[in-house]
Amino acid sequence: MQGYFITFEGPDGAGKTTVINEVVKAIQGQCKREILVTREPGGSKIAEKIRDIILDPANTEMNAKTEALLYAASRSQHVSEIINPALKRGDLVMSDRFVDSSLAYQGQGRGLGIDEVAQINAFATGHLEPDLTIFLDLDPAQGLARIAKVRSGSEDRLEQEKLAFHEEVYRGYQKVNQAHPDRVKVVDASQDLPQVVAASVKLVKSTFPELF
């Protein structure tokens, strides 16, 4: 029995973590499968240690290729240890970020090339792709303003990047979304949280009606 794999993507400040948690609350009493919520970078013991290296604001000297490879290494461990076993059990896996983040942040934002970063991650994940990606669409400036309001002074290394970087990341996401219209569905994340959650729940239920 094969499971289902849903990823949530979007710029920093779009509210991915909050939305995922609210979506789970909304569907867990109705879903016929176990639900596993996870995140990237991280999701497993080794992957979380790599996460700490990647996001540590002190690591300002980290070059773009190192950053991309660390994300891929974390993802490889996450997939083999957490995601694939859950999918084999038949679970519904919901991940806060996945490969699309690397394509947008390192491929476009860091200028490494989306295709090049895609190749690295295809190797790292064994070509695993989500069944559905919900992209929480938010203007980068608005996202950074949200972060500053909530976590002022405690932003991670990527959140501390200037607006120009985050705008480039957003352009990367747009390219990825346009290349995968069947997989990626867009939700306006500038709406109030209940509206964003409702739209996300609707997408999950309409994409996988057999789960409910």
Curated annotation (Swiss-Prot):
Enzyme Commission code: 2.7.4.9
Reactions catalysed according to its record: dTMP + ATP = dTDP + ADP
One GO term (biological process): dTTP biosynthetic process
GO molecular function: ATP binding; dTMP kinase activity
The keyword ATP-binding is assigned to this record: yes
Binding site for ATP: 10-17
GO cellular component term, pick one: cytosol
Protein keywords: ATP-binding, Kinase, Nucleotide biosynthesis, Nucleotide-binding, Transferase
Pfam families: Thymidylate_kin
Keyword Translocase: no
Described purpose of this protein according to its UniProt entry: Phosphorylation of dTMP to form dTDP in both de novo and salvage pathways of dTTP synthesis.
Family: Belongs to the thymidylate kinase family.
Entries under HAMAP family matching the protein: Thymidylate_kinase
Protein name (database record): Thymidylate kinase
